[in-house]
Amino acid sequence: MADLLNVLKDKLSGKNVKIVLPEGEDERVLTAATQLQATDYVTPIVLGDETKVQSLAQKLDLDISNIELINPATSELKAELVQSFVERRKGKATEEQAQELLNNVNYFGTMLVYAGKADGLVSGAAHSTGDTVRPALQIIKTKPGVSRTSGIFFMIKGDVQYIFGDCAINPELDSQGLAEIAVESAKSALSFGMDPKVAMLSFSTKGSAKSDDVTKVQEAVKLAQQKAEEEKLEAIIDGEFQFDAAIVPGVAEKKAPGAKLQGDANVFVFPSLEAGNIGYKIAQRLGGYDAVGPVLQGLNSPVNDLSRGCSIEDVYNLSIITAAQALQ
């Protein structure tokens, strides 16, 4: 974990990337904000009621005098953001509805990112995943050519680092969706200094089993390879693989001779949200890997979701990762 963060901090040094932390009334978030403010790579923008945030800072003995603190209900930016929101939603929200929605810290914070007044957002310490992701999907939206966002985890143990996806967002995936996730995961790997070798997982290796689920992954492999070639993406994408064939060279040699990947994958695309979510938790709980995420990919600007059980360190680390995404 330290290795990844050190690489990112080096990239971010002197950049002062603006990251919105909507949950300024949460002590973990406010503490992390003061730690980030002391760096030259992330400048936090904290949202919340001034009186409550200042009272919390006093209670925690935190100096927030240099932190930008915005109350969505009273901010002079609100009128501008309301108009921008109404235009963005194209008839799906009246000005009155927008006024009400932008009292919500996640909607207000997301609008700061959309309006270019911030570079990214980290929320979820006191909100559900839906509360964090919904405004991003409505306002920031997905990149051109990408139909969905997805959630990856960095799985880290010592100097070993993998990416698992999708582990957080999409309960229903077709071949096109899996292909998009494979390509976006490869791009994420590149942006974090990895050489992406993407294995698309199944209970079958190179046609060893037959079912509709296997066919879906096989079709996804072809689509992902085609998309990567069109975009001149420097990545290897291959499959379908059982997990052992994707990660153990000796098994790959027996099960998938001649495959582009020979047990050296570092990015794993699971065939379903069930498999991805279970898989990362097994690696975390039984394998002893640190799970960093979910890191959302596919959006026009970075928005990331914390667990409500997060620590101060989690808020700090995810803010650094979000800032690094903003530089892509």
From Swiss-Prot:
Its EC number is 2.3.1.8. GO terms for cellular component: cytoplasm. GO terms for biological process: acetyl-CoA biosynthetic process. It comes from the Bacteria. The keyword Coiled coil does not apply. Belongs to the phosphate acetyltransferase and butyryltransferase family. This is Phosphate acetyltransferase. It comes from Staphylococcus aureus (strain MSSA476). The lineage of its organism: Bacteria, Bacillati, Bacillota, Bacilli, Bacillales. The gene is pta.
